[in-house]
C-alpha cells in the first residue's frame, strides 16, 4: 500500500492507496510544530481505526508547500514505515513539459494536480485549486504545463477582511438568500461568495481567450464544490485530484 501526503499551508490531506484504489483519506490541520513521532502516532491511530496495518505501507509520497515540515515527514517515513519517501520536486518525473520560465518555481501541488487532471481527463485543461491560495493552471492538449495564475484564497481573504475591519463579524461561507444583503452578515456572504465566483469566471474566461481553445475546467480543493454550485464555468469537481496525482507520480518514478 502507498501512503500519500498533500501538505498545504492550512490543511494536510493524507490518503492510503492499494494500487489504484483509494482506501481512505483524512484531513488534518497543518502544524509546523508537529514532530515525526507525533505524525507516526497519529497515523498509527488513523490506520488502525480503519483496520489497516502500519506494516502494509510500503511506500510514502509527499507533496508539501511548507518546507519546515519536510524533514519531520521524511524522518517519520523512515522510522515508522522503513522507507525513503518520494518527495515531489525538481528531478522527479511528472510526464509534463513544464513551460514556466523557471520550472523549479512551480509549486509541487500545482504539478501534481496537472498530472492527475491530464491523466484522467486529457487536455486542454484549466485546473482550479481552492486552497489557501486559489490557483489556476493551464495544460495544453499535448500535456504541456503552460503556466497559470495565483490569487488569494477565499478563507485568507475573508480573514483579512474581518481582521482589518473592526465592526465586521466572522461569517459562514454559504449562499445568501439574495445578492442584495439586508444585514451585515448577508451582505458579507454576498460579497464573499459572488466576489469569488466572479473572480473564477473572469479569470477562466480570459484564459480561454488567451489560449484560443475551449479547455475542460476541473476544480479541486476544500471549497471547490461550494463555488462550482454557483457557476457554469466549472465542468467537474474532483475532490481527490491531488491524491490521485501523487499516486500517479509514484508509479512513474517507481523502481
Curated annotation (Swiss-Prot):
The keyword Nucleotide-binding applies. A monovalent cation. Ammonium or potassium. Pathway: Cofactor biosynthesis; coenzyme A biosynthesis; CoA from (R)-pantothenate: step 1/5. Pfam families: Pan_kinase. GO terms for biological process: coenzyme A biosynthetic process. The keyword Kinase applies. InterPro entries: ATPase_NBD, Type_III_PanK. Its main location: cytoplasm. The active site is at 109 (proton acceptor). K(+) binds at residue 129. Belongs to the type III pantothenate kinase family. Catalyzes the phosphorylation of pantothenate (Pan), the first step in CoA biosynthesis. Homodimer. This is Type III pantothenate kinase. It comes from Syntrophomonas wolfei subsp. wolfei (strain DSM 2245B / Goettingen).
Amino acid at each position: 500500500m502507498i501512503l500519500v501526503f498533500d501538505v498545504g499551508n492550512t490543511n494536510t490531506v493524507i490518503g492510503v492507496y492499494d494500487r489504484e484504489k483509494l482506501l481512505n483519506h483524512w484531513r488534518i490541520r497543518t502544524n509546523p510544530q508537529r514532530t515525526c513521532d507525533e505524525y507516526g502516532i497519529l497515523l498509527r491511530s488513523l490506520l488502525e481505526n480503519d483496520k489497516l496495518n502500519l506494516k502494509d505501507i510500503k511506500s510514502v509520497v509527499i507533496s508539501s508547500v511548507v518546507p519546515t515540515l519536510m524533514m519531520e515527514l521524511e524522518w517519520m517515513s523512515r522510522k515508522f514505515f522503513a522507507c525513503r519517501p518520494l518527495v515531489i520536486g525538481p528531478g522527479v518525473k511528472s510526464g509534463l513539459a513544464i513551460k514556466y520560465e523557471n520550472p523549479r518555481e512551480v509549486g509541487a501541488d500545482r504539478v501534481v494536480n496537472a498530472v492527475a487532471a491530464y491523466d484522467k481527463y486529457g487536455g486542454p485543461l484549466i485546473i482550479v485549486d481552492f486552497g489557501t491560495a486559489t490557483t489556476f493552471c493551464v495544460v495544453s492538449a499535448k500535456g504541456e504545463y503552460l503556466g497559470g495564475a495565483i490569487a488569494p484564497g477565499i478563507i485568507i481573504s475573508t480573514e483579512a477582511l474581518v481582521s482589518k475591519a473592526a465592526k465586521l463579524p466572522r461569517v459562514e461561507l454559504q449562499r445568501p438568500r439574495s445578492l442584495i444583503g439586508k444585514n451585515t452578515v448577508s451582505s458579507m456572504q454576498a460579497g464573499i461568495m459572488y466576489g469569488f465566483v466572479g473572480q473564477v469566471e473572469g479569470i477562466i474566461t480570459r484564459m480561454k481567450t488567451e489560449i484560443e481553445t475551449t479547455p475542460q475546467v476541473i476544480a479541486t480543493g476544500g471549497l471547490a464544490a461550494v463555488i462550482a454550485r454557483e457557476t457554469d464555468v466549472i465542468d467537474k469537481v474532483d475532490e481527490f485530484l491531488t491524491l490521485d496525482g501523487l499516486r500517479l507520480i509514484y508509479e512513474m518514478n517507481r523502481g
